[in-house]
UniProtKB/Swiss-Prot annotation:
A GO-annotated cellular component: cytosol
Annotated site residue numbers, Could be important to modulate the pK values of the two catalytic cysteine residues: H175, E230
Reactions it catalyzes: (2S,6S)-2,6-diaminopimelate = meso-2,6-diaminopimelate
Cystine crosslinks: none
One MF term in the entry's GO annotations: diaminopimelate epimerase activity
Keywords assigned by UniProt, alphabetized: Amino-acid biosynthesis, Cytoplasm, Isomerase, Lysine biosynthesis
The species this protein was found in: Methanococcus aeolicus (strain ATCC BAA-1280 / DSM 17508 / OCM 812 / Nankai-3)
Pathway in which this enzyme or protein is active: Amino-acid biosynthesis; L-lysine biosynthesis via DAP pathway; DL-2,6-diaminopimelate from LL-2,6-diaminopimelate: step 1/1
PROSITE patterns in UniProt: DAP_EPIMERASE
EC category: isomerase
Binding positions for substrate per the UniProt entry: N13, N69, G79, N80, N173, N212, E230, R231, G240, T241
Any coiled-coil regions, as ranges: none
Protein name: Diaminopimelate epimerase
Length: 295
């Protein structure tokens, strides 16, 4: 008998969902290597990451969300992933709405728009952002761990750019946001050289635990476009926490309002900044169920 799984995606960001709510399917010390192996496109199922549905470890949560990237690293949070997770949980595990989700990045609350017991869209309370360098983490000469890094430059070592101006924020996981116009960059240039630029910034020495990278174009105060390079996954069609971070930084620097429509390669997300925190809204899709025999 094989291992049951569900393939899902959120704006083209695709995941393999493993239901461990009623018991462990993959041993804890094997989850990283398992995820790395089955995410390899062309050789196994192929995905940007693996989501494990688990019982909560504390009664204040309804259920636990865990996600491993395609390189085997475990991430604290994932915006597109948690929307997929929430749809899966409501339709396959427990019909609870809203859903209090335990993540490594803290509590996330999913509120689902439901029609005929099918989840059509999910609004997730993403919590409040943190900007201090200790929360990224980021190590910068001349700055303390309580300082922030907003609209400042870091040096690069590639032949394309000597430096780049960026801002950093943590929304459960860390993100670097780069506004293309402020760096005299155009989207075609970024797309052509994303493997070089995204990878170098992700692995830059100032980020000891690496970082997610987003190149942002401001369309108008209510609309942005984003090109994403995810930590541990590389280019992806969308990133929910990255979109949230991009809007937070854009708003903080006076470039956008509190409610923004973000266009990503995989589709659109709506982000709203309120007094109690930030909300992300978008859909999620169950593509197919399957059974894995070699892993």
């Amino acid at each position: 008998m094989g291992l049951n799984f569900t393939k899902m995606h959120g704006l083209g960001n695709d995941y393999i969902v493993i239901n461990e709510f009623d018991g462990e399917k993959i041993k804890e010390d094997e989850k990283a290597e398992f995820s790395k192996k089955i995410c390899k496109r062309g050789f196994s199922i192929g995905a940007d990451g693996v989501i494990f549905v688990q019982p909560a470890t504390d009664e204040k949560y309804d259920i636990r969300f865990r996600i491993f990237n395609s390189d085997g690293s475990e991430a604290e949070m994932c915006g597109n992933g948690i929307r997929c997770f929430s749809k899966f949980v409501y339709e396959r595990v427990m019909q609870k709405n809203p859903l209090n989700v335990e993540t490594m990045g803290g509590l996330r609350v999913s509120e689902m728009n439901i029609e005929n017991n099918i989840v059509k869209s999910i609004k997730v309370f993403m919590g409040a952002p943190t900007f201090e360098l200790k929360d990224i983490p980021m190590v910068v000469e001349g700055k303390s761990e309580n300082d922030v890094f907003l609209d400042e430059e870091i040096e690069l070592k590639n032949a394309l750019l000597n430096s780049v101006k960026l801002s950093v924020v943590n929304v459960g996981n860390p993100h670097a946001v780069i506004f293309m116009k402020d760096n005299n960059l155009k989207a075609p240039f970024i797309r052509t050289h994303l493997n070089i630029l995204g990878k170098e910034i992700e692995h830059h020495s100032v980020f000891p635990e690496k970082i997610n990278v987003h190149f942002v174009e401001i369309v108008n105060p209510q609309e942005i476009k984003i090109i994403t390079w995810e930590r541990g996954a590389g280019y992806t069609t969308a990133c929910g926490t990255g979109t949230t971070s991009s809007v937070i930084i854009a708003n903080k620097l006076g470039k956008t309002g509190n409610k923004v429509l973000a266009h990503l390669d995989g589709g659109d997300l709506e982000i709203e900044i309120k007094e109690d925190g930030v909300y992300m809204e978008g859909d999620a899709v169950i593509v197919y169920d399957g059974e894995l025999y070699q892993y």
